[in-house]
């Protein structure tokens, strides 16, 4: 069971051939505050997984053996970037990020019946391409940055704005498949 509304996470599981269902957790991400980004994403992932796991019906959901919660943020120059609040914030962030590096952090929480909860954060370094103001404005005008942690989608138009990665590709999309393989 994927405890996420993210279409990108669903696509990752589908492409990897991992059968799953989706239930949105309903967790208000703004209610969970933490100064340290690694702990923040772990707490959010845990809250999402626990919210869905607690709502499982023992009789109707008996075939569900695991619940996976995830949450991602970009750690950039000491700040935590979730989804931009609007186009102005997205442009301001991209003006700072262009030509620099940031760490995309994804918290993962796997809850299985009668097994210990598994909680982890996977980090991937993202090298952003140097972009002109016109390139930044065109990308933000596409609307894509407003839907993604950090304000970019590696698997979409945002891939054109990235020079490279150090770490897990799928983690930047929202779920580390190598991590998931090791815990399943």
Swiss-Prot record:
Q: Which organism is it from?
A: Synechococcus sp. (strain CC9605)
- Similarity comment: Belongs to the Maf family.
Recorded catalytic activity of this chain's protein = a ribonucleoside 5'-triphosphate + H2O = a ribonucleoside 5'-phosphate + diphosphate + H(+); a 2'-deoxyribonucleoside 5'-triphosphate + H2O = a 2'-deoxyribonucleoside 5'-phosphate + diphosphate + H(+)
UniProt keyword rRNA-binding, yes or no:
no
Give its localization. Answer: Cytoplasm
Query: Transmembrane segments in this chain: where?
Result: none
Q: Which UniProt keywords apply?
A: Cytoplasm, Hydrolase, Nucleotide metabolism
Q: Which GO terms describe its cellular component?
A: cytoplasm
Q: What cofactor is this protein dependent on?
A: a divalent metal cation
Check the record and name the InterPro entries matching this protein: ITPase-like_fam, Maf-like
Give the GO terms filed under biological process for this record. nucleotide metabolic process
**What is the protein named?**
Nucleoside triphosphate pyrophosphatase
**Which residues are catalytic?**
71 (proton acceptor)
**Any idea which GO molecular function terms this record carries?**
nucleoside triphosphate diphosphatase activity
What Enzyme Commission number(s) appear in the record? 3.6.1.9
Write down the top EC class of this protein. hydrolase
The source's superkingdom equals Bacteria
Chain's role: Nucleoside triphosphate pyrophosphatase. May have a dual role in cell division arrest and in preventing the incorporation of modified nucleotides into cellular nucleic acids.
| Coiled coil feature spans | none
């Amino acid at each position: 069971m994927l405890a996420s509304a993210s279409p990108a996470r669903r696509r990752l599981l589908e492409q990897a051939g991992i059968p799953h269902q989706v239930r949105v957790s309903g967790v208000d991400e703004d209610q969970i505050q933490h100064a340290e980004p690694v702990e923040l994403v772990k707490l959010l992932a845990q809250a999402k997984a626990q919210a869905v796991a607690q709502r499982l019906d023992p009789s109707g959901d008996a075939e569900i053996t695991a619940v996976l919660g995830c949450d991602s943020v970009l750690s950039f120059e000491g700040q935590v970037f979730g989804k931009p609040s609007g186009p102005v914030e997205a442009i301001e962030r991209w003006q700072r990020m262009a030509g620099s590096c940031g760490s995309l952090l994804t918290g993962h929480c796997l809850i299985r019946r009668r097994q210990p909860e598994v909680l982890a954060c996977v980090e991937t370094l993202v090298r952003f391409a140097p972009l002109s103001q016109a390139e930044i404005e065109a990308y933000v005008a596409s609307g894509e940055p407003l839907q993604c942690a950090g304000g970019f989608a590696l698997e979409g138009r945002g891939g054109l704005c990235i020079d490279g990665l150090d770490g897990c590709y799928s983690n930047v999309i929202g779920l580390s498949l190598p991590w998931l393989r090791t815990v399943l």
